[in-house]
């Protein structure tokens, strides 16, 4: 779920908290688990939209789609898919990016994260970066604990940083 907190303009100690995006039930009350928004993780807020990035690597067993970025319209409260994490080439996907194991066919195993508006930095309106967490892109030990951070267990997964343009703000 993603919540929206609207503060009272006259008294910031008062406000209304509501569910803005719910992946468990639709507005009509129907069960939508795995078909709508899954495990919202990161958000990027612009003047008119909230971009909600799913954390699909939670291996949601009911997932029916790969990780998505949803565009939530602040004015209307509606949301739609903005970007899909479709991997493309099935042969490459299963030989390089998902070399073995039970997770290779699961939906949402890669995710988007860290969406940032860089328009003001580079002087090009509507330009954003997005990080792709490619959790099954293993490639031997090439990506073994790349940050060298102390971790409960070592990990290895590749990633990419994308620059996208013409993003509505």
Each language-model region and where it sits:
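Sequence/structural signature of beta-propeller domains
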Residues: 1-169
């Amino acid at each position: 779920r993603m919540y929206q907190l609207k503060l009272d303009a006259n008294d910031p100690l008062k406000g209304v908290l509501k569910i803005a995006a719910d992946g468990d039930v639709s507005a009509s009350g129907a069960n939508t688990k795995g078909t709508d928004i899954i495990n919202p993780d990161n958000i990027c807020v612009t003047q008119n939209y909230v971009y909600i990035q799913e954390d699909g690597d939670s291996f949601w067993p009911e997932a029916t789609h790969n990780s998505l970025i949803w565009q939530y319209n602040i004015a209307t409260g509606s949301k739609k898919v903005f970007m899909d994490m479709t991997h493309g080439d099935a042969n490459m996907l299963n030989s390089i990016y998902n070399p073995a194991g039970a997770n290779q066919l699961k939906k949402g195993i890669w995710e988007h994260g860290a969406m940032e508006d860089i328009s003001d930095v580079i002087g090009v309106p509507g330009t954003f970066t997005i990080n792709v967490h490619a959790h099954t892109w293993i490639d031997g030990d090439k990506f073994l604990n790349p940050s060298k951070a102390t971790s409960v267990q070592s990990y290895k997964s590749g990633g990419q940083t994308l620059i996208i343009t013409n993003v509505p703000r």
